[in-house]
Amino acid sequence: MAVISMKQLLEAGVHFGHQTRRWNPKMKRYIFTERNGIYIIDLQKTVKKVEEAYNFIKQVSEDGGKVLFVGTKKQAQDSVKAEAERAGQFYVNQRWLGGILTNYKTISKRIKRISEIEKMEEDGLFEVLPKKEVVELKKEYDRLIKFLGGIRDMKSMPQALFVVDPRKERNAIAEARKLHIPIVGIVDTNCDPDEIDYVIPANDDAIRAVKLLTGKMADAILEGQQGVSNEEVAAEQNIDLDESKEATEAETTEENTSVESN
C-alpha cells in the first residue's frame, strides 16, 4: 500500500508549481506540464518520492535518531510546530538563527538562559525585583522561546533535517550540508533539488499541501518509534524468559538434590 495517494495530493493542491517564468531548470524532470502559465508537478513522481523520504525518515527513527523540522514561512509555521511536537521531534518555525547546527555551543548558552529565567520565576525572584526588570526578563524569555523553544531539548545534532522550501531555508541547508546531515525537503518548481538528499517535488506555498506532507514525515517517525518499542518489548520478554528459565532450572536442581538426599 502506498504511503500517500494521488487523490490526497490532488485534493491538497500539491501539483501546483510556480509561474513558468519563476522556475529552476533542474526541476524539469519533476514537471508534468504547463497550464495557464503555471507548472504542474508530476504527482506520480511525488508519490514515489514521498515513499522514499518516508522510508528514510522511518529508518532514522527506528535507529533512535532525531529529526529537526524547519519551516519558517507563514504557510509552514503551524504545521511544522504541530507535527514535530506530535512526533516528539525538534523544530524551528521562526527565523533560523545562524549557528543552530554549526555553532551549537553558543546557541546552547542562549537555550540555557530559558531555564534560568524560568527558575527565577519559580523561586519568587520576580516578586522582589523591580517591575521594569521583570518586564524586560519576560520579554527576553518570550523572544528566546519564540526562536529556540523548539530546540531547547536538543542535546546533540539531529540525524536528519526536514525542510519546507529550500530557497527560504538556505541557511539551515548550508549548515546541515556542512555537517553531512541528510536533508529531506518539500521542493517546489523554483528550487534547486541538488541541495536536497530526499526530494519531495510539491507545492510549498499551499497550507494544505505543506500540512499533508509534513504530517506524513511525522507519521514515518511514529511508525519508526513503534518499531523501536516493539524491539524493546521483545528484548524485555527475552530477558523475562531467560530469568524464568534460570528460575525453573534452579528449582529443578533443588528438587533433585532433595530427592537424592532422601
Swiss-Prot record:
Keywords: Ribonucleoprotein, Ribosomal protein. It comes from the Bacteria. GO terms for molecular function: structural constituent of ribosome. Residues 228-262 are annotated as: Disordered. It holds the Pfam family Ribosomal_S2. Belongs to the universal ribosomal protein uS2 family. One of its GO terms (biological process) is translation. GO terms for cellular component: cytosolic small ribosomal subunit. SUPFAM superfamilies: Ribosomal protein S2. It comes from Staphylococcus saprophyticus subsp. saprophyticus (strain ATCC 15305 / DSM 20229 / NCIMB 8711 / NCTC 7292 / S-41). The keyword Ribonucleoprotein applies. This is Small ribosomal subunit protein uS2.
